[in-house]
């Protein structure tokens, strides 16, 4: 049973749409996973996505190490989304 109604862009209020557009225009390119839930509270979504974007894109790690850290953490914490979303990205960055 779904606890929160899924939404389309047309369902978003002005504040949600602004945060949505910031996310889509950034390096993520789309609003998926936890970001979709967080967007129910646009203030939370804005801050959480900024922290996540920094952790993923703003560190000194190259992309392959960043993705390795993400999937390792996702695996340790049994985060299905992190594993399913980031494992293909990590594999695409392996140069063997």
What residue spans do the PLM features occupy?
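Amphipathic alpha-helical segments within well-ordered protein domains
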Residues: 35-36, 52-53, 70-71, 87-91
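Conserved small/polar residues in nucleotide/adenosyl-binding loops
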Residues: 94-96
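Mid-length scaffold segments of soluble, non-membrane domains
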Residues: 78-83
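Short, charge-rich binding segments
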Residues: 62, 92
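Acidic, glycine/proline-rich low-complexity segments that act as flexible tails and inter-domain linkers
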Residues: 1-61
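Alpha-helical scaffold segments that form or flank carboxylate-/histidine-based iron centers
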Residues: 33-36, 63-76
């Amino acid at each position: 049973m779904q606890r929160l109604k899924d939404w389309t862009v047309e369902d978003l209020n002005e504040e949600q749409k602004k945060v949505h557009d910031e996310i889509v225009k950034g390096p993520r390119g789309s609003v998926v996973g936890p970001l979709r839930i967080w967007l129910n509270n646009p203030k939370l979504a804005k801050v959480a996505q900024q922290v996540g974007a920094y952790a993923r894109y703003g560190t000194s790690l190259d992309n392959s190490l960043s993705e390795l850290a993400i999937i390792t953490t996702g695996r340790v914490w049994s985060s299905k989304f992190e594993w399913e979303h980031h494992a293909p990205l990590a594999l695409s960055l392996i140069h063997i």
